[in-house]
């Protein structure tokens, strides 16, 4: 049986083993999937040890995505653009030293938005909040959907400006700009995506009022039993639709499964089961 794992620190909270077990059962793929706690200074050793005992691939979570990027011997275009890796695929007998690094986070976000939520991004005005790793990982897949405009806003404006400039040249058909939260005053957006960690601190990004266009979607990469602080603030400010990041979690896992096994699982029943468990917790 082929072995896969998710590696991180901490890792006990991870839903990845449950998700991939459901995918394997649904598709009839014979595989095992486990969670591995790596020491903060022992990521590379942990990965290589897992590969040495027959591991075929790994998901990578906090805080090791940059180290995974450095460890990979080759990168997918979306991983190169993200500057971080959340999925590793190990080479077979002919290429034992090959480690492919991929980043499925942004693709998972886009699939959740466009397929699960029925929210097309083409021609829309998109606002991405944050300029860290989560935001960077989402940018290329978002831009590939050809929105009319994509604005990056961050507490430190210079980081948003720099991130926007790094992607603007490759996407001349999209109006890309970056700045601070206060620069959003008087502007309106069709899709607002929170890629900041503010919800972890039980806070919402300090956004000016009135940024949501009629029927706009507010999307938080974080998730919980109820509204996150960002979604609660969006509801109060008139967002037409609200969504959290549980679907993104399932869809990025499906992208990893597709990379490893060559088959895309049906995510709808897995997402519904996770949502029910979360509500009952």
From Swiss-Prot:
Name this protein carries in UniProt: Shikimate dehydrogenase (NADP(+))
GO cellular component, one term: cytosol
Catalytic reaction list: shikimate + NADP(+) = 3-dehydroshikimate + NADPH + H(+)
Family of this protein: Belongs to the shikimate dehydrogenase family.
Assembly and binders: Homodimer.
Highest taxon above the source species: Bacteria
GO terms (BP aspect): amino acid biosynthetic process; aromatic amino acid family biosynthetic process; chorismate biosynthetic process; shikimate metabolic process
Keyword Endoplasmic reticulum: no
Active site: 65
Organism: Azoarcus sp. (strain BH72)
General function of this protein: Involved in the biosynthesis of the chorismate, which leads to the biosynthesis of aromatic amino acids. Catalyzes the reversible NADPH linked reduction of 3-dehydroshikimate (DHSA) to yield shikimate (SA).
Enzyme class at the top of the EC tree: oxidoreductase
InterPro entries for this protein: Aminoacid_DH-like_N_sf, NAD(P)-bd_dom_sf, SDH_C, Shikimate_DH, Shikimate_DH-bd_N, Shikimate_DH_fam, Shikm_DH/Glu-tRNA_Rdtase
Keywords attached to this entry: Amino-acid biosynthesis, Aromatic amino acid biosynthesis, NADP, Oxidoreductase
A molecular-function term among this protein's GO annotations: shikimate 3-dehydrogenase (NADP+) activity
Annotated shikimate binding sites: 14-16, 61, 86, 105, 223
Residue positions binding NADP(+): 130-134, 154-159, 221, 245
This enzyme's EC code(s): 1.1.1.25
Pathway where this protein functions: Metabolic intermediate biosynthesis; chorismate biosynthesis; chorismate from D-erythrose 4-phosphate and phosphoenolpyruvate: step 4/7
